[in-house]
């Protein structure tokens, strides 16, 4: 009986210690957060200063806190745009694209929607990864080709929805570059299959060029493979 009581008392003591430790840890985290009492104005100002100084990770932290604490505040929309930009510049295109998509779903008629689409397309191509250097050489991989198709869809959406946007001329130029790069990629893949006697796959790739990129110089190359 006494042993059972001692075990019970020990269990209660351990539970109390664990609870106290967790509470202290939580309090320490709260006390270490210098932003805990910041207003929306203060959070946005600090986030924007971090952004302007290219301190991307710090900006992301402040924008995240601003969005979570003041989701319907005066800075909510602008903070989402700038947070997407911070993710993109910080080399995190997946997060940037996700942030752009979330913004476009929430505010489809926002005046800055054209800019967000433009940023999404650039993030999709992940320019920091050297995509456009490879594009200039027309030397893109299958992974690049998929990114190019996704970006092409976004650029096209931009010029269709916002033909007079300040970003439309650049989007059109990028569309032309992407079309040429994709057509060249398909021809290269078709030749690869043809050399290895995989004729069905080669014809399928060549047919894609003829169907989807008939106005490019690579149409003649595709016809030769056919």
Label every model-predicted segment:
Residues 2-7, 14, 18-226:
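Acidic, polar-rich low-complexity tracts and alpha-helical solenoid repeat scaffolds
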């Amino acid at each position: 009986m006494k042993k059972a009581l001692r075990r019970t008392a020990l269990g209660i003591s351990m539970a109390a210690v664990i609870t106290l430790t967790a509470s202290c840890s939580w309090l320490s985290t709260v006390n270490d957060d210098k932003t805990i009492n910041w207003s929306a104005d203060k959070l946005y100002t600090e986030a924007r200063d971090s952004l302007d100084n290219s301190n991307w990770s710090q900006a992301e932290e402040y924008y995240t806190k601003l969005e979570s604490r003041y989701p319907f505040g005066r800075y909510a929309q602008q903070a989402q745009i700038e947070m997407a930009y911070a993710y993109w510049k910080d080399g995190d295109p997946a997060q940037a694209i996700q942030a752009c998509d979330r913004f476009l779903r929430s505010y489809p008629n926002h005046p800055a929607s054209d800019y967000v689409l433009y940023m999404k397309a650039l993030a999709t191509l992940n320019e920091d990864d050297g995509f456009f250097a490879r594009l200039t050489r027309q030397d893109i991989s299958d992974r690049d080709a998929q990114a190019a198709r996704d970006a092409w869809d976004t650029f096209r959406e931009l010029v269709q929805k916002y033909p007079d946007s300040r970003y439309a001329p650049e989007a059109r130029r990028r569309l032309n570059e992407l079309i040429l790069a994709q057509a060249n990629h398909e021809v290269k893949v078709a030749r690869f299959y043809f050399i290895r006697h995989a004729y069905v796959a080669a014809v399928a790739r060549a047919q894609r060029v003829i169907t989807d990129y008939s106005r490019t110089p690579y149409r003649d190359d595709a016809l030769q493979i056919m």
